[in-house]
Amino acid sequence: MKTFDVLVIGKGNAALCAALSARDTGVEVGMLEAATIEESGGNSRFAGGVMRFAYDSVEDLQKITDIPEDEAKDTDWDSNTIDEFYEDLYRVTNYRTDPDLSEALITKSHEGMVWARSQGARFIPNYGSQSKMINGKRVFHGRFPLTVNGGGAGLVEDLTKTAEKKGVSIFYETRAVSLIYDGQRVLGVRAKQKGQLVEFHAKSVILACGGFEANPEWRTRYLGPGWELAKVRGTRHNLGEGIKMALDIGACPYGNWSGRHAVSWERHAPEFGVVENSHDPYRHSYPLSIMINAEGKRFVDEGEDFYNYTYAKYGAEVLKQPGQFAWQVFDAKVRPLLRKEYSGRNVTKIKANTLEELAEKMEGVNAKGFLKTVREYNAAVKKDVEFNEGLRDGRCTEGIEPTKSNWANTIDTAPFEAFGVTCGITFTFGGLRINHQTGQVLDLGYAPIPGLYAAGELVGGIFYFNYPAGTGLVSGLVFGRIAGSGAAAAIKAG
């Protein structure tokens, strides 16, 4: 048996931020990680690394990363004011996001980024996917101009180094299975450590071990039939165990339990994410495409918004299609604009010099239906509006359903290419109800459960239906800090 003041379950971004926040108060901190050292880091290790936080100007960014003065002046850095952040989060969640949780997330996001830098996290401008050269000037769009150096894996490695230097004890291949609870407060956890059942005692336990996206039985139970067939973009270790052990002692479930972050993903990707090429299966250039199902029909508004605001919901739409697949179809006019992943290895791709040839090559697609769809789509494109991929250009279709609201180009210039996609699930939205100021888990009567805290993807109530890109890592950072400081403060208060 080992004893700590604070015991953190998990070792991703939220868990590490919780551990560091608690450790900086002087308490003894331990971490339990189900994975091996090589696989550790939860979903954070697979994340792209973009960070959505509130900022008004480049001066706010310079508190987080070093930006040379000439670069600062010669670039349009966009903004993501507190009001703009609220607007985006409320809009994409259909105004269902919890007001207290969203306020904490948004108002503490910038200070959280500054703090993360002080803990060893390294941030750099996100030139690759979130900026364009317009009239000789680099212009950011999408409201998240910074990313983590080295992506999510780099973030995990940097924060792990800091945690180890500060004396946080990390136990690998140690999967928490239940809470030690005396009916009044949580006293620790029982865990499987390399096949043996062991106990860890603590004055406070912080659950930060992710959702249930890697559990096909829970996916089917809560997300619905067919979800057992989805690919998992990240770790295989997020099985919902942290949520279950809290519910078992009376914690309150909260949030969009049938909701999830799920994207268009390489059709023949592995069952789980692969850290070494975690970005290769991305297929995020679909706003420039038409997406076709097995019947040869379109089924979403590909140009509803920038992919930052639609990618997390469109994977579910692909999963609903016959055979759980779709094809993203492009012509030569937009091919140079596609993200680099479309030119990588292990890409399900076909190419043809005519639409008829493409139709015959698209595996599992009704060729006549596809050609009819393209004819009707091309005729519906509003050609008097100028195409501009850097803006919501309003170049749309008229008279067809589903409409395409932006970036509608005719599919008429050879060669034509189609890329096969399926659904890749990232994380689940349902979880536990917490106190937004302390991170304490609440019971069914909304009273705090003494000694139990939570952070990260297993916190319910923040995301509903959809998700604005870059918010997940920042949410883990913010609520990890809150849970860590809350747990430590309760210990010191006696």
Identify the role of each PLM range.
Residues P99-L197, N215-W218, S264-H268, V381-T410:
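Conserved redox-cofactor binding core of oxidoreductases
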Residues L239, I243-V365, G369:
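An anion/pyrophosphate-binding glycine-rich loop and adjacent beta-alpha core
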Residues D24-S44:
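Glycine-rich FAD pyrophosphate-binding loop
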Residues Q193-Q196, F200-A269, G439, G470-L473, ...:
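Glycine-rich loop(s) and the adjacent beta-strand/alpha-helix scaffold that form part
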Residues M1-A14, G30:
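Beta1/beta-strand and adjacent pyrophosphate-binding region of the FAD-binding site
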Residues R45-N80:
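N-terminal glycine-rich dinucleotide-binding loop that anchors FAD/FMN and/or NAD(P) in oxidoreductases
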Residues A72-G136, N353-E376:
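Rossmann-like flavin
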Residues S178, G369-N466:
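A glycine-rich dinucleotide-binding beta-alpha-beta segment and adjacent secondary-structure elements
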